[in-house]
Amino acid sequence: MRGMGNMQGMMKQMQKMQKEMAKAQADLEAQEFTGTAGGGMVTVKATGKRVITDVVINEEVVDPEDIEMLQDLVLAATNDVLKQIEDTTSQTMGKFTQGLNIPGM
């Protein structure tokens, strides 16, 4: 019967961890991230849900003769903000799986 108490304790611990993970995920999703490129000439903002909320382009980088450069800057700023979200998510959620030997995590 000792094993049942252990199992109940483990289940409670898992439920607590699930609640903490859900809160951490909600906090991440509500957070706003900012990516930049060209020394701040292009800024892209996104939520933790990876929804782009704002793009700011400094007029100095708008050259009708070189649209490709502007496209590259927007792409770089977007990739920067997405990487920040990914890194923050991995760091935050990694705390929950640290020490667990779960395949695929």
UniProtKB/Swiss-Prot annotation:
Main location: cytoplasm
Alphabetized Gene3D superfamilies for the sequence: Nucleoid-associated protein YbaB-like domain
Keyword field contains Cytoplasm: yes
Region (Disordered): 1-23
One annotated Gene Ontology cellular component of this protein: bacterial nucleoid
An MF annotation (GO) of this entry: DNA binding
Pfam families: YbaB_DNA_bd
Keyword Cytoplasm attributed: yes
InterPro entries: YbaB-like_sf, YbaB/EbfC
TM annotation in the entry: none
Comp. bias intervals (Low complexity): 1-16
Subcellular location: Cytoplasm, Nucleoid
Superkingdom classification of source: Bacteria
Keywords: Cytoplasm, DNA-binding
Coiled-coil region(s): none
HAMAP family xrefs: DNA_YbaB_EbfC
PANTHER family in the cross-refs: NUCLEOID-ASSOCIATED PROTEIN YBAB
Family in the record: Belongs to the YbaB/EbfC family.
Subunit structure: Homodimer.
Role summary: Binds to DNA and alters its conformation. May be involved in regulation of gene expression, nucleoid organization and DNA protection.
NCBIfam families: DNA_YbaB_EbfC (TIGR00103)
Protein's recorded name: Nucleoid-associated protein lmo2703
Organism: Listeria monocytogenes serovar 1/2a (strain ATCC BAA-679 / EGD-e)
